[in-house]
Amino acid sequence: MNELEQNSASTITISLCMIVKNEAATIERCLRSVASATDEIIIVDTGSTDQTKELVRQFTDKIYDFPWIDDFAAARNAAFSHASQEYILWLDADDVLLPNDLQKLLLLKQNADGTVDAYTMNYNVSFDEGGNVVSTLGRNRLVKRSKNFQWIGPVHEYLEVGGKVNSTDISVTHKKENYDTCDRNLTIYENRLAKGEDFSPRDLYYYANELNDHQRYEKAIEYYQKALDTQLCWVEDNISACGKMADCYSALNDDQNKLKYTYLSFSYDTPRAEFCCRLGYHFLGLKKYQQAIFWYTLAINLQKPKDPLAMLNNACWTWLPHIQLCVCYSNIGEIQLAIEHNKIAESYIPNHPSILHNNSYFAQVLSSSS
């Protein structure tokens, strides 16, 4: 740490600001996971009819009612407006800080750089059967109150920050209980369209996501294309739109366009492992093993994107291309290479059924050959 950093390091105070509605199933778990790191808890309730408020009162009396007006940003900005501490932390009711991440937050709180305007944290959003993190993205999670940063967007809102932004290795874990196909967000978008509102490039992209989630693939493709055509989307949304369009075309059994939009993702940035793995899987399915090997090998040699807010499928950046290379090399008779890649995959997921199966298979192959 240099002298300037030493002088600016100090203990900060934190307001936790949340918006809730009928969160009785998860709110207590969320607050227990983070309360010890906060100096103030602000809860804005948008119309709970369950026991949410009663549960929250165990942790704070700063509970404010806010009428639901189909605008998430308005509700979050209302929550932020009640904060009185130096920094604001925000969470959703189905998020938690795992014990290790709570300790990291407490350490950051004691040794924060007071010149930083916003800290990013990882957001772990999906997991495999073994509990390993599959998808993660970065969020501006802890922000200086005096900067008055604002939330933007009625749905799929984002916190617009500027100034000095530092990344952390703290993770917030999403632990959603029920993965339903709620129509709420889609309804908000369609009501806005019915009123004649012009959608921003970001709105076009997220409306397409809602259509995609509701299996309205043709219309989703239309709006993804509109988003791309603006040439104004965030690069990560452009890349994601390409992948989601490829998924839509796959659902429509259109392999030509599926490949077209997979390749198109490369025009927005250096290739991403997720898309290389898509291509590897495509050629593996066609038993074109050399082409599959090319794409999986490229995946394992890529550098992760530098943007801390980029969404990553961790499997594609770690074990998945290796286990697929194992399959490819095995099919062309390169057993030693297959074993090597299986071992690398095993270092990431030692108890995965595919790893265990492969170990047994290769033991038999080597035994037979000897």
Task: Label each region the model flagged.
Residues 33, 37, 45-55, 68, ...:
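A conserved acidic beta->alpha catalytic loop
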Residues 25-28, 50-59, 100:
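Acidic helix N-cap motif at the loop->helix transition within catalytic regions
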Residues 54-82:
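Conserved donor nucleotide-binding strand/loop of the catalytic core
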Residues 2-5, 13, 74-80, 86, ...:
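Catalytic-site signature of metal-activated, phosphate-bearing donor transferases
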Residues 1-33:
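N-proximal low-complexity "stem/linker" segments adjacent to membrane-targeting elements
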